[in-house]
């Protein structure tokens, strides 16, 4: 079984969440590929059994959309590209709004035909406005991400 994790990260916190989810998948024997959204090929997403999409939470989007590279990746996918595939979303924020970004990602993945495992993790890390990197995710959030990976592997 193979999983693809697509993410965008300005300060490294969303990448860290992707790595934590990957560890949970790996524990269950899933082969994981992690790619930056801006460099990933949306046409190849259907080559994987599981697709995970992660984005930081930016206040300027009013918590309605993922980061632009993530949105562009999902928008470039063909309708029903994920039919028969398992998918999930995750987001990282310094303050609030991550749950809404996760829900927006999940809605888009479902519109592409995926069976969405919900809710994906909303991780607390970083600093408001990304003026500095801020603190890393706490142990509870790291475990939440790993558990989400294990859950996806079990449901696949």
Task: Give each language-model segment a name.
Residues 1-4:
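Extreme N-terminal starter segment of soluble prokaryotic enzymes
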Residues 13-16, 20-35, 47-156:
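FMN-binding flavodoxin-like domain, especially the glycine-rich phosphate-binding loop
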């Amino acid at each position: 079984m193979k999983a693809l994790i697509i993410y965008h990260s300005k300060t490294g916190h969303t990448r860290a969440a992707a790595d934590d989810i990957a560890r949970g998948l790996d524990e269950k024997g899933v082969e994981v590929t992690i790619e930056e959204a801006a460099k990933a090929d949306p046409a190849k997403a259907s080559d994987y059994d599981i697709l995970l999409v992660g984005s930081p939470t930016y206040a300027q989007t009013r918590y309605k959309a993922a980061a632009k590279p993530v949105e562009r990746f999902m928008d470039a996918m063909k309708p029903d590209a994920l039919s028969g595939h398992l998918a999930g979303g995750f987001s990282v924020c310094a303050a609030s709004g991550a749950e809404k970004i996760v829900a927006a990602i999940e809605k888009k993945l479902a519109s592409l035909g995926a069976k969405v495992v919900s809710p994906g993790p909303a991780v607390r890390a970083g600093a408001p406005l990304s003026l500095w990197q801020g603190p890393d995710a706490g142990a509870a959030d790291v475990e939440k991400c790993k558990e989400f990976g294990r859950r996806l592997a079990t449901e696949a």
